[in-house]
């Protein structure tokens, strides 16, 4: 499913957030421009898709993504990322993360339809783009996030380093 949930501790240690990070399916996707093998393309519905058959694992896409959303599948030797569960959404189902979220915190829908549930929530909750300064025009928006979350999210999971059962990740490199 290629979603990473980052455990982020606020700098003053008064708040902990579990923040899901997925591919933002950017309108101006840096990964698409960076891929030398043209394995990344935009679908008609706006999704950014990696064709595993064309991926030559040059890794430029991994470096180009400002959200850290692309990882390397070492077994298949390809880059991969969230595709909004195309296999589900093509048959009218929500992505797995949305349908399995116990708190209903994830919403999927058509942002171009002002009557859709997601469009109404975006307006009501004042949802914002993650790392708006990157000017990628992402299709994924967040409610109630703060700048400190963005700054910590790509650096890995911030947990007690004495906890040996924790796997720290940074761009799919296990530490």
Predicted feature residues:
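Non-ligating segments of multi-cofactor redox enzymes
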Residues: 1-175
């Amino acid at each position: 499913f290629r979603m990473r949930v980052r455990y982020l501790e606020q700098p003053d240690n008064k708040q902990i957030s579990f923040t899901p990070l997925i591919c933002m399916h950017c309108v101006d996707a840096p990964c698409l421009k960076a891929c030398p093998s043209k394995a990344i393309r935009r679908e008609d519905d706006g999704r950014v898709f990696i064709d595993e058959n064309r991926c030559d694992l040059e890794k430029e896409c991994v470096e180009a993504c400002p959200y850290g959303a692309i990882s390397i599948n070492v077994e298949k030797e390809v880059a991969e990322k969230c595709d909004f569960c195309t296999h589900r959404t093509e048959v009218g189902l929500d992505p797995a993360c949305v349908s399995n979220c116990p708190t209903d915190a994830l919403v999927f829908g058509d942002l171009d339809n002002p009557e859709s549930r997601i469009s109404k929530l975006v307006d009501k909750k004042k949802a914002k783009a993650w790392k708006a300064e990157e000017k990628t025009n992402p299709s994924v928006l967040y409610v109630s996030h703060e700048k400190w979350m963005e700054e910590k999210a790509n650096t890995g999971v911030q947990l007690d380093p004495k906890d040996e059962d924790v796997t720290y990740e940074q761009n799919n490199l296990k530490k």
